[in-house]
């Protein structure tokens, strides 16, 4: 199953990361 999580980058922006 593929899950997704929202993590903050070093510059402070929010990016959507996909992980298995």
UniProtKB/Swiss-Prot annotation:
Its EC number is 3.1.3.-. Its cofactor is Mg(2+); Mn(2+). One of its GO terms (biological process) is glycerol biosynthetic process. The keyword Magnesium applies. Pathway: Polyol metabolism; glycerol biosynthesis. Keywords: Cytoplasm, Hydrolase, Magnesium, Manganese, Metal-binding. GO terms for molecular function: hydrolase activity; metal ion binding. It comes from Bacillus licheniformis. The keyword Hydrolase applies. This is D-alpha-glycerophosphatase.
């Amino acid at each position: 199953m593929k899950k997704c999580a929202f993590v903050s980058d070093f510059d402070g922006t929010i990016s959507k990361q996909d992980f298995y």
